[in-house]
Curated annotation (Swiss-Prot):
It comes from the Bacteria. It catalyses: L-aspartate + NH4(+) + ATP = L-asparagine + AMP + diphosphate + H(+). One of its GO terms (cellular component) is cytosol. The lineage of its organism: Bacteria, Bacillati, Bacillota, Bacilli, Lactobacillales. Belongs to the class-II aminoacyl-tRNA synthetase family. AsnA subfamily. Its EC number is 6.3.1.1. The gene is asnA. Keywords: Amino-acid biosynthesis, Asparagine biosynthesis, ATP-binding, Cytoplasm, Ligase, Nucleotide-binding. This is Aspartate--ammonia ligase.
Length: 330
């Protein structure tokens, strides 16, 4: 039992360390330290889809402020790039840990505990466009494939990912599968191609509904790109044979500029956010144009080691029935 546990931990560490090294080298980012707490009222907290309640924390020696455990570091990263004067093409990555207690379900792929490679880069002049988004996606996908090949060489786990990732807009997907739900569409397209980047998540589609929810103040999901499609963000999805479904590894995108921010908060009715310090700084031109995202660490490990449950690669909290159903939950 001890031997199996140690081997399990070594595998997890190998995947994380290998991916980190490739990501830093290929994406050309520097690893930095990030926060676990965000001060309430400064607008730095990531509101995700806008419905999640963060964990509130009171600090004894700072009685005049309330803090929250971060959901992600989307806004903090952009603030940090500005604060320390990162130049065009430069960026950072954080080994981020967060709590999301309002997850809809605790299942094979969802946990209260979230760990990500949370990265952000300053966009080079003239590249705030779909082509640069795709170029960055291809770089990250290359890192995923290189890590998968390293796992294959070390642990004899067969590599399954295609050489290229397929790009498709959410508008194309709803037209292709009009009678399917968003999740069913993801399953259909990802099973066909093996690896997909789904572009444009957050805006309302021709069927009157968004593909999925996104907060209005980090990713740009409204800018028109090509053929009348909208959005400069998306998800990296791969086909997971263990689960028999599409599997999200990363959510990422080009971040809002001043116009996209104002447009999106009006669409979602969140104009009050424009009064936060972070949002004022963006509107006043104090932040660089950036691209960024989060890559799930436990999800990456789970996929590359062909595990059935995310609890096999991270230590979290689970209902007893989950622990009873899976022998290798940590």
């Amino acid at each position: 039992m001890k031997k199996s546990f140690i081997h399990q931990q070594e595998e997890i560490s190998f995947v994380k360390n290998t991916f980190t090294q490739y990501l830093i080298a290929k994406l050309d980012v520097v690893e930095v330290q990030g926060p676990i707490l965000s001060r309430v009222g400064d607008g730095m907290q990531d509101n995700l889809s806008g419905t999640e309640n963060p964990v509130s924390v009171n600090v004894l020696k700072i009685p005049n402020a309330t803090f929250e455990v971060v959901h992600s570091l989307a806004k903090w990263k952009r603030h940090t790039l500005a604060r320390f004067g990162f130049n065009e093409g430069e960026g950072l990555v954080v080994n981020m840990k967060a709590l999301r207690p309002d997850e809809d379900s605790l299942d094979q792929t969802h946990s209260v505990y979230v760990d990500q490679w949370d990265w952000e880069k300053v966009i080079p002049d003239g590249k705030r466009n779909l082509a640069y988004l795709k170029e960055t996606v291809e770089t990250i996908y290359k890192v995923i494939r290189l890590t998968e090949l390293a796992v294959e060489a070390r642990y004899d786990i067969e590599a399954v990912l295609p050489k290229k990732i397929t790009f498709i807009h959410t508008e194309e997907l709803v037209a292709k599968y009009p009678d399917l739900t968003p999740k069913e569409r993801e399953n259909a397209i990802t099973k066909e191609f093996g690896a997909v980047f789904l572009i444009g998540i957050g805006g309302v589609l021709p069927d009157g509904k968004p593909h999925d929810g996104r907060a209005p103040d980090y990713d740009d999901w409204t800018t028109e790109t090509e053929n009348g499609y909208h959005g400069l963000n998306g998800d990296i999805l791969v086909w997971n044979d263990q689960l028999g479904s599409a599997f999200e590894l990363s959510s990422m995108g080009i971040r809002v500029d001043e116009e996209a921010l104002k447009r999106q908060v009006e669409m979602t009715g969140d104009q009050d956010r424009l009064g936060f310090d972070w949002h004022k700084s963006l509107l006043n031109g104090l932040f660089p144009l950036t691209i960024g995202g989060g890559i799930g660490q436990s999800r990456m490990v789970m996929f590359l080691l062909r595990k059935q449950h995310i609890g096999e690669v991270q230590t979290s909290v689970w209902p007893q029935e989950v622990r009873d159903s899976y022998d290798n939950i940590l």
